[in-house]
Amino acid sequence: TLENYEVNGFKVEGTLTRTVKGFTGTWLSGTWEYEVEVEDGKVTGPNNTYFTWESERTVTVSLPSFEVSTTGEAEGVDLFGKAYTVTITTPLVIKRDCEHIVSGVLEVSPTGVEKRVINYGNGTCDKNVTITIGDKVYDVTL
């Protein structure tokens, strides 16, 4: 549980729980799996605006590559008081030698507007993502 925790003037609240689900294989070639749950998550800015979220994710770490794969979903209320959901439809993958997500698809569904689909690509270590909103596609460099 976060208490009196701030980052650059933003107050962060909530309860984060990690549960180790298990390890398979050997230390040289194995897989860790754990669940991460956020309850009552809230970030409040210096001007007292805030957003909230709750999430459940499953994280898998593969050895020896330290490739990390994440699945799951979240929901909350944005800065304007509108509900949203986030669903990882294709696992988000991070590789040890890359600073960005290298593959996976994330869907963001804010209330009252079209769903946003964020595609991180096919595994190449680059800064490129594609964002699709309705029939419009945007190529974005992170």
Residue spans for each PLM region:
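Short, isolated positions in well-ordered beta-strands
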Residues: 12, 84, 115-116, 138-140
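C-terminal structured interaction module
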Residues: 90-127
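Short, low-complexity, Pro/Ser/Thr/Gly-rich segments in the mature regions of secreted, periplasmic
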Residues: 130-142
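Short helix-loop boundary/capping segments
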Residues: 8-95
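A generic structural signal for short, solvent-exposed coil/turn residues
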Residues: 28, 78-80, 98, 110, ...
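Short polybasic amphipathic segments
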Residues: 1-3, 34-43, 72-76, 105-108, ...
